[in-house]
Amino acid sequence: MGGLKFHVLMYPWFATGHMTPFLFLANKLAEKGHTVTFLIPKKALKQLENLNLFPHNIVFRSVTVPHVDGLPVGTETVSEIPVTSADLLMSAMDLTRDQVEGVVRAVEPDLIFFDFAHWIPEVARDFGLKTVKYVVVSASTIASMLVPGGELGVPPPGYPSSKVLLRKQDAYTMKNLESTNTINVGPNLLERVTTSLMNSDVIAIRTAREIEGNFCDYIEKHCRKKVLLTGPVFPEPDKTRELEERWVKWLSGYEPDSVVFCALGSQVILEKDQFQELCLGMELTGSPFLVAVKPPRGSSTIQEALPEGFEERVKGRGVVWGEWVQQPLLLSHPSVGCFVSHCGFGSMWESLLSDCQIVLVPQLGDQVLNTRLLSDELKVSVEVAREETGWFSKESLFDAINSVMKRDSEIGNLVKKNHTKWRETLTSPGLVTGYVDNFIESLQDLVSGTNHVSK
């Protein structure tokens, strides 16, 4: 693609689920000849540098994350702390403003992409730059945040769906996010998001109109500014990396589509009793299974938290793993037939691209909305039933898995048919590149009207 070449400064929130989608987009921009300066904490550099496909066009710069009372000394990323302490890390991010201004002065970008650093538009204005609020959660999540305080389960006026909502029984997902800190740490998450949306020059969302067009229109109307879509921005398949030999060997012992794979993301830490119930539910399926979760609260290892006698009973067909796994490669293995997921936004796209049946057990508010989008709106998955406390039983987990894995299951056939349709849509030739090309053209138009100010 020809036209104006521009330089973007990206400053994502210090969470893997934010930094990696920013970098996926950076790769798409760099592929077209644009330059990206990517600002992240030092600890995140090792994790991300191997995902940089264009190191000549994408340059990492590190920020020093100041210490904030209440956080362990040296904390730089969300993965190091409980989710309830994220507000403290956001406060630490706010303290990097001087460093960001120094980088802007040094590299002279044309645009700044950001998400939770709500003060970026103020910085950009001082330098005569335009800003892009890049949303890497679902459009439905953002749409639901624009009119807070309503009754759970009741769509506010103009909201585009009666299905993609938090219901009364989902109140537990909000409690999971409530801060346990007594220190005044500035704006809360909702305030950061809404301020960023209102003060940015444009809003960009990592989604496709085919999936969330009605929510994107709602956001554009409510915020009274242009909403650009990048498309799903899938990472390029890394043909040089293969699935770890331990999993290749283990999976090769099972029939196609027979293994149940469960992964709940890097943020989710279950209570011990819920962790054990998860394990027992997987055992009930009678299927071979792999569960990849962090050790539960109060346990330093997976093994010490397993139900009594569990390892012996599932020996040879069940594995519970407490470390990172190659989720996309596992989902593409022919033996894996069902994916039990928390439905984080990244995992949502990975599940849609897979051939697996999808069972969802969300833990946080945005994951619930993603789940409703897939289960109730698109009808490509099944949600695990749970109580108002958020508790799900081994029986409800078994029922959900069985409903999609059982031969001749009516619901299993329905979600498989719908899933196939949406997967074919998302992988249709030209869809992703079309979104990226249109997005870049919109950025070129934005930059061409920018007047830089030297400082």
Curated annotation (Swiss-Prot):
CDD domains: GT1_Gtf-like
InterPro entries in the record: UDP-glycosyltransf_plant, UDP_glucos_trans, UDP_glycos_trans_CS
Binding site for UDP-alpha-D-glucose: 266, 325-327, 342-350, 364-367
SUPFAM superfamilies: UDP-Glycosyltransferase/glycogen phosphorylase
EC number annotated for this UniProt entry: 2.4.1.-
Keywords for the protein's UniProt record, in alphabetical order: Glycosyltransferase, Transferase
GO biological process, one term: anthocyanin-containing compound metabolic process
An example Gene Ontology molecular-function term: UDP-glucosyltransferase activity
Entry's family note: Belongs to the UDP-glycosyltransferase family.
Protein name: UDP-glycosyltransferase 79B2
Organism: Arabidopsis thaliana
Native organism taxonomy: Eukaryota, Viridiplantae, Streptophyta, Embryophyta, Tracheophyta
